[in-house]
């Protein structure tokens, strides 16, 4: 009898704990721009890791981008571990993109590469030209 009473609170705790996790319920939209950026950043490899920049996953997200997306949301919805998830990486990209209202694909890609002022940094033009090449081709997503 004592064991039965202990199992119920433990079960109840796990149900409650799963509700504490603050999920971002955004549709996962993957379009030509995202697919192209994934090809440039990682070749579409969700396990890609650049130790020099601590950039992770298919979109090569650095810790500063996770912090920025959480700042835009006003809460800590994403962790550094989420960078390994293709779906969560795309969500983070789409959140940043949604805050760049009216931006062209070029501005979005160059901002993704160089930060908020990236579209004005000459070095990000080469990045954009690579992305643009992929947006104009048929990319097979992994």
Question: At which residue positions do the language-model features occur?
Answer:
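Secreted/periplasmic proteins that engage bacterial cell-wall peptidoglycan
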Residues: 38-73
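Alpha-helical segment that forms one wall of the substrate-binding/catalytic cleft
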Residues: 63-120, 128-137
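Extracytoplasmic/secreted cell-surface and envelope-processing proteins
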Residues: 46-47, 119-122
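Sec-dependent N-terminal signal peptides
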Residues: 3-14
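Short, functionally critical alpha-helical segments immediately adjacent to catalytic or ligand/cofactor-binding
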Residues: 28-45, 61, 93, 108-116
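Extracytoplasmic and endomembrane cell-envelope/extracellular-matrix remodeling and assembly machinery
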Residues: 19-27, 136-142
